[in-house]
Amino acid sequence: MRPVPPELLDFIDRHQTFYVIGHKEPDGDCVGSQLALGSFLKRSGKGVALCSAGPFTRTEILPYESRFSPIVPDEKASERAAAIVLDCSSLGRIGDVAQTLPPVQIAFIDHHAAGEAKGEVVFIDDRAPAVTLMVLAIIEAMGGKPTKEEAEYLLFGLCTDTGFFRHLDESSSETFLAASKLVAAGASPKRAFHLMNGGKSLFSRKLMGETLTRAEPRYDGALLVSYVTLEDQQRYGLASRDSDMLYQLLLSVAGCEAAMIIRQESETECTVGLRARERVDGGAIAASFGGGGHRLAAGLLLRGGLEEVREKLVAAFEPYLGEDS
């Protein structure tokens, strides 16, 4: 991982109040990073407002929704206020929160290679498996250690973005050392696992079954494609969307190099999630349509009907999975 830039430490030292903001449609790494950094800043004597546009549709982060404001609160405004944006590098990714953000200095902290960060401080480390590890590095660079509660948040985020360490390889010893620090500080891997994988509704399992049934092979099975319709979401509810396990099941199919799940947001707009093995750069495909993410996990929002979006995205896999690849 890259060292914490001195200008970020100076940025934190110079300001007294922080709007700690994450991306819309937050996940465990985003929420865990915000909660841990916010807690550390508070016990360092800083004012903190945690902001998220939501929605908190993932069951594992739903218990934390009440800790976040969907807007930047006016009462936190001060001359020494600043914003720290976590797990994304564009104000366009923070949703409606951006409309309430006053003209303050901004620091971006992210681990996605694709981005357009333009702030007073930009700390991007695409070698970091999770932003929570970058937050741990910031805490340590400021001479601190995470509390038990902060360690729980950080381990939760780390487990989220690494698939509970499934996505790590032999070059990941630094990550396991960091995880060991968090466990030593009181974080429980067992609690993190149950938070990530427990509490699912029966409806979510039924929706998963339908989505699996619809999966169709492309490129001789190297790409598996499925979708979730508006009718599905009306029938099973938004809280039933549980794509992480679905991706695992699809990628476990012999010969599968990538999985794509398309979710209708309206008749003219779809959210697309991509998961891949080493052969495919999902982040590059997503970026070509205005999205972003990592090589192995990425996403985007695309205008168009379900079939139109599906065929556009399937064609984008040609350089990786086509006959001439």
Regions found by a protein language model. Name each.
Residues 1-7, 98-107, 127-135:
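An acidic intrinsically disordered interaction segment
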Residues 2-25, 32-62, 77-80, 160-288, ...:
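Hydrophobic helix-and-loop "lid/oligomerization" segment in the mid-to-C-terminal part
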Residues 2-7, 87-89, 139-141:
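Short, motif-level signal for alpha-helix interfacial/capping segments enriched in acidic residues
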Residues 9, 72-75, 95-98, 122-125, ...:
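A generic local secondary-structure boundary/capping motif
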Residues 26, 30, 88-90, 113, ...:
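Short, glycine/acidic-enriched loop or turn micro-motifs at the edges of active sites
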Residues 65-121:
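Active-site cofactor/cluster-binding pocket
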Residues 109-178:
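Short alpha-helices
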